[in-house]
Amino acid sequence: MNAVLKYHHKALIRDRYVVEVVIYEVSVTQKYPDGIKYRLIFMDQKEGKKILMDNHHPKGPHVHINEHELEYSYVSEDKLMEDFNKLILTHMGVRL
């Protein structure tokens, strides 16, 4: 699998929250049918709460909200970012 880094951003917000977004363009395969591999992380360093979105094989697209794991239906990069921001606001009370 040839992966081309499409986007990477990591930041510390208010000396408390870590946000990291990594998106790779990959060949369309059975493992990555959308041609994208991603990892989105938002973590509260003070309380240990976290929101994670990724699509590693064999699980495919899914979301971690603290210790809970949920399936996720990937539609597009824009929708992925929109959903990530909504999850952060809903579960952490932080607007990016």
Language model features with spans:
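Short helix/strand-capping connector loops at secondary-structure junctions
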Residues: 59-72
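The feature represents the first ordered module of a protein
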Residues: 1-62
